[in-house]
Amino acid sequence: MSGRSTVAIIGGTGAEGGGIALRLAKAGHCVLIGSRDAAKAKAAASALAALAGVTIEGDGNRAVAAAGEIAILTVPYAAQRPTIEEIRDILAGKILVDATAPLVPPRVNRVQLPEGGSAVAAIQALLGEAVKVVSAFQNVSAEKLRHLDQPVDCDVLVCADDAPARQAVIDLIATIGMRGIDGGPICNSAAAEALTSLLIWVNRKYKVPGAGIRITGIDD
């Protein structure tokens, strides 16, 4: 997936989704912003496009999910399952990148994994083999993504049961100047999800805007 792709950002009106959208659009991909409210999605897409000098379009979640070759889910944990239920019939045959971290307010800097261990693995179980669910972007700062004049100095852990889907997402990540790290099967997503709360703690403790992770010992 190193060429130009059509990418639907489901729940793309938030900070994380907007940051990913900006990076992908600047890299030359066709980016679609989705929301439950199509008007809100169009307004967000217009604002992002003006900010970056690129073309980004917006529409309802179902419309952009249908148009996208790959979908990236960037909604809060509480909205993860309802959003997937809204579009699950459209996702068959596609790759779904799920950036969900199971943050439970108000104590978002404490690890609170769901009973099954991984929020993203639960979505793979829900959707079945027809959809290739890939966990990625949980540990990437939205603030860093949105500063297009600066590189995002961290790695992206990528987990999925389907190895070709994992590699496709790693290749997509490379197009925005970041390094995807093959993190193995979807159950390993629990580690990436837990790291999000730890990084929030680090941000607050050390007063940094967006701590990330870097895997050492691997050649670029």
Regions found by a protein language model. Name each.
Residues 1-47:
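NAD(P)+-binding Rossmann beta1-loop-alpha1 motif at the extreme N-terminus of oxidoreductases
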Residues 3-6, 93, 153:
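Phosphate-coordination loops involved in phosphoryl transfer and adenosine-cofactor binding
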Residues 9-10, 73, 158:
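Hydrophobic Val/Ile/Leu positions in short beta-strands of Rossmann-like dinucleotide-binding domains
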Residues 52-54, 59-95, 102-107:
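Rossmann-like NAD(P)-binding element
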Residues 58, 132-138, 181-183:
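General beta-strand structural signal in soluble alpha/beta enzymes
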Residues 100-143, 147-148:
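Rossmann-fold NAD(P)-binding glycine/threonine-rich loop
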Residues 154-220:
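Active-site-lining helix/loop region of Rossmann-like oxidoreductase modules
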